[in-house]
């Protein structure tokens, strides 16, 4: 959520692919009909509604002013995660960076959303221990003390289920330069990594799976003054063994190689092992993605480089790093750079290397407006029916066009196929892939701008030659029935395109669209979840640049709730960024 990079693929997850053209409806190989997407459903209803507490989810009665305000303030949500209960496929859980807590708590906090209707309807909640949470669940969480000290922000959510009705929710909490309750000094960006566990309220009723908050465990704490920040989390639970595997990035700025750390639980999330470094020999490490093989093998892939002592060393080559464990995550082999590629990143469109561009003081030489999208992958999935591992990543073609490429391995990651385009498209950019696998099917989703009427390989998604933005971005889905070796045609998941370039952050002067979206699957039940701007209320641009990205409430037009992190009521809809979901029929 806080640093440069995308996020990671998940556990019972697999490949990210897309074949076909915009709006393709051709049948897949073998004559089967293509998959189809269901209705787009708004997950985060923060207008004329209310959030419920973890206590209420489990049958209690606690509520507070934070939850009430969350239902009316029309704030941002991004970086969604999604997981489907293997015991009851109608039970879906989702999470996101939820800024509904800003008016009362001053910063974003992990949202917790639950559906018992297969994603057709949702109940919105928050992870316990947000600032102002006086419930028994909140005060008992180890995050409460950190929040009391100033680490009031949380994000980078990822979720996974075991086979006993337990849901595991991983993320990090931090501050933006305030005391954290431990160091007693400023500019301690914490980066504490945690895993929360939700169990069934009634073990005999699987529809209550994951509805009762149980506890939160801290996996790693940042140490002030060492230039370290824990971020970019990933989590996978193994339904067969009950083990829970977690990995994350430990960023060191420009002073040394970032690290990938790993921890596991062998008691259904009650405790976790001390973190171990699994990225030795690789630099520039970020965004781990975990997959579990048919016999419990644990594989981890991430974006790395050959940068030597420094991630920014001259001549560093980017690529997909990989390592695996044959003893359920107890020990790992030596990490290697499995393949190299040129990542597709937002910085190529700014003209000065900036990862995102907006209105002054965030304007860029090219005059374009766009959020960062520089976490290139890889995203890893295991198709245990076909015995393959699949990786996918966003690559810059020689023209500058962003496309998703994938590779597969039939020998547990010892060797990989040559990279191939997942969803070849003549126009448009593709970014933020996510993978999952189930029932011998590898599913992939990603953002796609192939419907952009102003597309040029040298321009950011949804930007015209004159710097005007538009709603051109969609979510697309594709699947592979042979372990990632080939892919069927892609379909459009979203029923309306969105403008990812709305300037809702930095005092309503710069966009942020999160670092990932998610696809989840159990059996033949598949769901996608993404960040969506269809409810955002735009505004005329008083500065005269006419970028089409200004939003209602902009201070240039007299707005007084000027900052994304100002504790004021807005309600204009200018900040109304939401999470949407859709069921996929294979």
List each language-model region with its residue ranges:
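Secretory targeting and sorting signals
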Residues: 2-29
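C-terminal PAP-associated
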Residues: 30-586
